[in-house]
Amino acid sequence: MAVKIKLTRLGKIRNPQYRIVVADSRTRRNGRAIETIGKYHPKEEPSLIEVDSERAQYWLGVGAQPTEPVEAILKITGDWQKFKGLPGAEGTLRVKEAKPSKLELFQAALAQAENEPVGEAITPKKKKAKAEDAEAAADAPAEAAAESEAADK
């Protein structure tokens, strides 16, 4: 029985996700698999590649032939070089940077807020500004009348 290591497609229309499976070479693309040995999500940045290295080495050792896309994935993870005995068995797989936890972000924001000086609001509220303008307008005619009376005397 000819065995291949190939990709089966999962996911939505524009978001493909693949499983790396070992299957009979005559089965359909998404047909029955003998074993699932990994997954590949090409749309993530960097692409998510997980391969069970031990099982991949076993299947390559017993004669399973990888398809071209799977061979490229195995080269990235370093499993192909390990199987062939070539240098560079560590692979070129890029790992996504770990996101800081929400608790750490909150603690940093809290520490930054404590260090800032506490003061009045920079801009006054609009209601106060309107009230002050109304008072100033009411005082202006009274002051003008008082000044004109002082000038007359």
Curated annotation (Swiss-Prot):
Bias (Low complexity): 137-153
SUPFAM superfamilies per the UniProt record, alphabetical: Ribosomal protein S16
GO MF annotations, alphabetized: structural constituent of ribosome
GO CC aspect terms: cytoplasm; small ribosomal subunit
Residue segments, region Disordered: 114-153
Key word Ribosomal protein present: yes
Keyword Disulfide bond: no
UniProt xrefs under InterPro entries: Ribosomal_bS16, Ribosomal_bS16_CS, Ribosomal_bS16_dom_sf
Coiled coil: none
Record GO biological process: translation
Keywords: Ribonucleoprotein, Ribosomal protein
Transmembrane regions listed in the UniProt entry: none
Highest rank taxon of the organism: Bacteria
Family (UniProt): Belongs to the bacterial ribosomal protein bS16 family.
HAMAP family with a match to the protein in the record: Ribosomal_bS16 (MF_00385)
Protein name, UniProt field: Small ribosomal subunit protein bS16
UniProt organism field: Rhodococcus jostii (strain RHA1)
